[in-house]
């Protein structure tokens, strides 16, 4: 058996066009990676890969007797996976620049804004997205997971390289970092959009979640952009002063708004950004910072910012009933809900109704906190189902309302009934009153008892608005 170093050296000497761990996806001159410990199974799929054009098989069981020089055997393949991926992904580095965006909230919006900014320069960029409505747009790829596994990522990267794209924009989730899905990738630029409590069902505690997010960044990174409106962003900056900072609160940042100017290291821009909420501005500044890092300049006309579009289901406005408004937003964390409600309170003079729930089989620690925020920041609340999945909706709601001491809320489990009731209440309120329907945003389904039921908040509200 060759050593790991010898295997990697041999791998570098072979002209490989791609790699996969699924024999169905093998193309000519691919490397096929077999993690199977079952010799018969490993041989079956490896032979299938060779028949389809694989040039080399990297396997956890020794197949040299059957595959001869087309087999690289490593009995410790699972533990050495990152080393092989680093070698295989290195071929992509020369052809495309990868931009990774992480954060508790704001990843999708930041990536979407950056994709549009790059289009101003007619730069060929792929946006990897798990928002179906966005995946229908030009130069996008749909992924069901925020951050897909290494092999699917390579598939998307190879496709982008074949299409001669120069940039690959992707969101990096804490699950993706922790599970090694981005192992081997060499990021040209990275961004932290925000950081607050979430996913403690998976990470178990806030410290673990924080450490995973922080591990995405290195003190040797040259192209980091972080929001310093959170403690993690400040810490990343303190440990790597080459990091560029953005803020909507602190003018010490490299990118911020001052009066009607966008201040950047590459010069000032007149502020034509069309969205006024602080969290949208913060996401945009992260995207603008990434653009500046890519080109070392901001070279488009500021007025072009007027053309920027927002993601569907992100603070999406529906005008109703004589100057009364409904917003649909994806806010499903305490920090996101607080940010949206602060924005609405600052903009509108009337009452605010907040309609929301919390996902089942997910971080339960945030439920009570979201209930308290909704009650503190709005005048009336309607608690309903989000995606209960297989968890008891009554248990979820009980955890949401446990610290809601004022009795200015209703519990309506059926989301359609809840939205209908919210619209009826809104109609009776004074002008400039708002109904916020939070939690699901763009989603086209609701998960109840393990089944996906077709449902979209925006569609349902538009169906009701003329009959309520």
Residue ranges and their predicted role:
Residues 1-83, 87, 272, 276-278, ...:
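N-terminal leader/targeting and accessory segments in enzymes
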Residues 16, 28-29, 54, 68-69, ...:
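Short, well-ordered alpha-helix to beta-strand connector turns
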Residues 55-61, 225-229, 355-356, 379-387:
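Short internal beta-strands
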Residues 59, 63-68, 163-166, 178, ...:
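Acidic, Mg2+-coordinating active-site environments of NTP-dependent enzymes
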Residues 64-65, 133-135, 176-178, 231-235, ...:
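Short, active-site-adjacent cap segments at secondary-structure transitions
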Residues 81-224, 228, 234-242, 288, ...:
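Phosphate-binding loop of NTP-binding sites
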């Amino acid at each position: 058996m060759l050593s790991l170093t010898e295997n990697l050296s041999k791998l570098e000497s072979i002209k490989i066009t791609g790699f996969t761990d699924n024999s169905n996806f093998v193309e000519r001159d691919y490397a096929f990676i077999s993690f199977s410990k079952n010799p018969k199974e490993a041989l079956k799929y490896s032979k299938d890969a060779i028949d389809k054009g694989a040039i080399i098989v990297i396997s956890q069981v020794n197949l040299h007797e059957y595959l001869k020089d087309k087999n690289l055997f490593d009995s410790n393949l699972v533990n050495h996976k990152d080393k092989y991926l680093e070698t295989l992904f290195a071929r992509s580095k020369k052809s495309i620049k990868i931009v990774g965006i992480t954060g508790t909230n704001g990843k999708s919006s930041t990536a979407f804004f950056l994709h549009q900014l790059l289009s101003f320069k007619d730069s060929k960029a792929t946006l990897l997205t798990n928002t179906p409505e966005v995946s229908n747009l030009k130069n996008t790829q749909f992924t069901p997971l925020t951050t897909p596994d290494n092999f699917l990522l390579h598939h998307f990267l190879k496709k982008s390289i074949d299409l001669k794209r120069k940039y690959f924009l992707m969101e990096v989730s804490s699950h993706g970092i922790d599970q090694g899905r981005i192992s081997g990738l060499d990021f040209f630029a990275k961004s932290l959009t925000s950081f607050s409590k979430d996913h403690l069902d998976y990470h178990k505690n806030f410290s673990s979640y924080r450490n995973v997010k922080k591990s995405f960044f290195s003190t040797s990174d040259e192209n980091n952009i972080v929001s310093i409106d959170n403690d993690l962003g400040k810490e990343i900056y303190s440990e790597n002063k080459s990091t560029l900072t953005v803020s909507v609160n602190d003018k010490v940042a490299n990118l911020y708004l001052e009066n009607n100017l966008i201040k950047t290291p590459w010069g000032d821009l007149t502020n034509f950004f069309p969205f006024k909420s602080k969290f949208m501005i913060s996401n945009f500044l992260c995207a603008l910072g990434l653009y500046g890092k890519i080109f070392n300049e901001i070279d488009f006309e500021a007025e072009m910012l007027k053309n920027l579009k927002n993601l569907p289901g992100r603070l999406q406005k529906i005008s109703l009933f004589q100057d009364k408004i409904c917003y649909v937003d994806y806010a499903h964390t305490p920090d996101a809900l607080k940010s949206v409600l602060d924005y609405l309170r600052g903009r509108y003079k009337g009452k605010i109704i907040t309609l929301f729930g919390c996902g089942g089989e997910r971080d339960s620690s945030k439920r009570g906190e979201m209930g308290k925020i909704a009650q503190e920041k709005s005048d009336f609340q309607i608690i309903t189902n989000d995606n209960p999945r297989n968890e008891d909706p009554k248990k979820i709601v009980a955890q949401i309302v446990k610290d809601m001491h004022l009795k200015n809320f209703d519990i309506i489990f059926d989301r359609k009934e809840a939205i209908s009731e919210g619209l009826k209440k809104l109609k009776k309120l004074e002008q400039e009153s708002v109904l916020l329907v939070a939690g699901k945003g763009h989603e086209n389904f609701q998960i109840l008892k393990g089944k996906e039921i077709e449902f979209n908040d925006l569609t349902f509200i538009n169906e009701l608005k003329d009959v309520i």
